[in-house]
Curated annotation (Swiss-Prot):
CDD domains with a match to the protein in the record: GT28_MurG (cd03785)
NCBIfam families on file: murG (TIGR01133)
Protein origin, superkingdom: Bacteria
Protein name: UDP-N-acetylglucosamine--N-acetylmuramyl-(pentapeptide) pyrophosphoryl-undecaprenol N-acetylglucosamine transferase
């Protein structure tokens, strides 16, 4: 029997690429042939081949923040991307096409629909991007990480790394801990300057006996500044540029302080850990605030806007949190998780491939 073929369309950021990889690996383990369509300048061009997934490329980018010339050339660039997408689809001959987001999904998704290829669309954020809003009108199935992000969609959750769902239940972790709280600060690959500045100062404002044990990840570009900030504040912190084992880091934490990207929010829920979200204030459509609100409005996380984040305020918040309160938040977060997201997205792809 000939192996079925999946074409994954995703690019630009890890929020699109990593969930796509999770589904790609799941279907490949079932014997599928997987090909990835992306942009040569996106992170997918470096990351995806490391997983032994062949690539097809098209040229297409966004308009936000671009000059007048780029906007004037949009029709020509779109026609080129349409043509390149048709070529890729004819070479790959996919049984099903999975769009996970990024600018390149728009021309490729439109051409997949035009050529009669089954199209599955997955929106990672709580507020859908423009490309997915348009593609949702022609897709065979529309899936969302957050409820009602797109009309007529199924809430599947975000595909996250499998080891996060395997972390023991919050009760078995929090109930057996004593001593100072363990706080994990995650700034991402680029770091988060606001967190790097405020957290050490907040820790310094607490009496020594009330200070948490802090692990603070800041990215390679920010790590020297972060270490200088801790030294200037006169407090201890395990400062690292990267964390290789995020599952272990989440499992060890009582509280995570982080941004509110779609994958971060989904990982926090899957891990079952309490979080204090500080949304990136310049995110498109302020979607990080909406992502964080999904958990915070149900008592599963705390939400502080960056313009309200101060050392004094954070110190007061930390001083007022008990491990029991954090356990309750962690339980609520785990209750909102969708641990079978990867499996569900893969199942839907299989269903549509069987009909093609």
């Amino acid at each position: 029997m000939t192996a079925r073929t999946l074409l994954v369309m995703a690019g630009g950021t890890g929020g699109h690429v990593f969930p796509g990889l999770a589904v790609a690996r799941a279907l490949r383990d079932e014997g599928w042939r997987v090909v990835w369509l992306g942009n040569r300048t996106g992170m997918e061009a470096t990351l995806v081949p490391k997983h032994d997934i062949p690539m097809e490329y098209i040229q297409f980018g966004g308009l936000r923040g671009k000059g007048l010339l780029t906007k004037l050339l949009l029709p020509l660039n779109l026609l080129r991307a349409f043509w390149q997408s048709i070529g890729a689809l004819r070479r790959v001959k996919p049984d099903v096409v999975l769009g996970m987001g990024g600018y390149i999904t728009f021309p490729a998704g439109m051409m997949a629909s035009l050529l009669g290829r089954p199209l599955v669309l997955h929106e990672q954020n709580s507020i859908a991007g423009l490309a997915n809003k348009v593609l949702a009108k022609v897709a065979d199935r529309v899936l969302c990480a957050f409820p009602d992000a797109l009309p007529n969609s199924e809430w599947t959750g975000n595909p996250v790394r499998a080891e996060l769902a395997q972390i023991p239940a919050p009760e078995s972790r929090y109930d057996h801990r004593a001593g100072p709280l363990h706080v994990l600060v995650v700034g991402g690959s680029l770091g988060a300057a606001a967190l790097n500045d405020v957290v050490p100062k907040a820790i310094a404002l607490l009496p020594e006996g009330q200070r948490p044990v802090v692990k603070h990840q800041a990215g390679a570009k920010q790590i020297d500044t972060l270490r200088a900030n801790y030294a200037a504040a006169g407090v201890a912190g395990d400062t690292v540029p990267f964390i290789d084992d995020m599952a272990a880091a989440y499992a060890d934490a009582d509280l995570v302080i982080c941004r509110a990207g779609a994958m971060t929010v989904s990982e926090v829920a899957a891990a079952g850990v309490a979080a204090l979200f500080v949304p990136f204030p310049h995110a498109v459509d302020d979607h990080q605030t909406t992502n964080a609100t999904f958990l915070s409005k149900q008592g599963a996380a705390l939400l502080v806007q960056q313009n309200e984040l101060t050392a004094e305020g954070l110190a007061k918040t930390l001083a007022g949190l008990s491990r029991t309160q954090l356990k309750d938040m962690a339980r609520a977060a785990r209750g909102l998780a969708k641990p079978e997201a990867t499996r569900r997205v893969a199942e839907i792809c299989s269903q549509l491939a069987g009909k093609s």
